[in-house]
Amino acid sequence: MAESPFKADIERAQKELTEKMTPGAIAYIPGSSVINKTGSWRVFKPEFHKDKCVRCFLCYIYCPEPAIYLDEEGYPVFDYDYCKGCGICANECPTKAIEMVREVK
């Protein structure tokens, strides 16, 4: 899977903020999972049904992490290395083209 186009920007911003802030339990950058793979502790994962998708991009827009990309045709592609399995994409999908299924490892 291709590397996130946002990764370099997030890493640079994180470095700048880290130098200026005192250490603590703060989420000071949204979309930090692109730097830290979080897919290994997911319980549910999104399963995509292309035949139901109307390419509204709501899943892409609402994903709190940059874990959804759009392919050349405008369909979502899920990067399971960074998907936390929160289900926001499935909840926002108006046609139920995304279903949350139990992760099997």
Swiss-Prot record:
Gene name of the encoded protein: porD
Entries under Pfam families matching the protein: Fer4_21
Iron-sulfur keyword on record: yes
Keyword Coiled coil: no
Entry keyword set: 4Fe-4S, Electron transport, Iron, Iron-sulfur, Metal-binding, Repeat, Transport
Molecular function, one GO term: 4 iron, 4 sulfur cluster binding
Protein residues bound to [4Fe-4S] cluster 2: C63, C83, C86, C89
Protein origin, superkingdom: Archaea
Cofactor(s), by name: [4Fe-4S] cluster
Protein name: Pyruvate synthase subunit PorD
Domain 4Fe-4S ferredoxin-type: residue ranges: 44-73, 74-103
SUPFAM superfamilies: 4Fe-4S ferredoxins (SSF54862)
InterPro entries: 4Fe4S_Fe-S-bd (IPR017896), 4Fe4S_Fe_S_CS (IPR017900), PorD_KorD (IPR011898), Pyruvate_synthase_PorD (IPR053389)
Gene3D superfamilies reported for this sequence: 3.30.70.20
Subunit structure: Heterotetramer of one alpha, one beta, one delta and one gamma chain.
Cofactor binding note of this UniProt entry: Binds 2 [4Fe-4S] clusters.
Sites where the protein binds [4Fe-4S] cluster 1: C53, C56, C59, C93
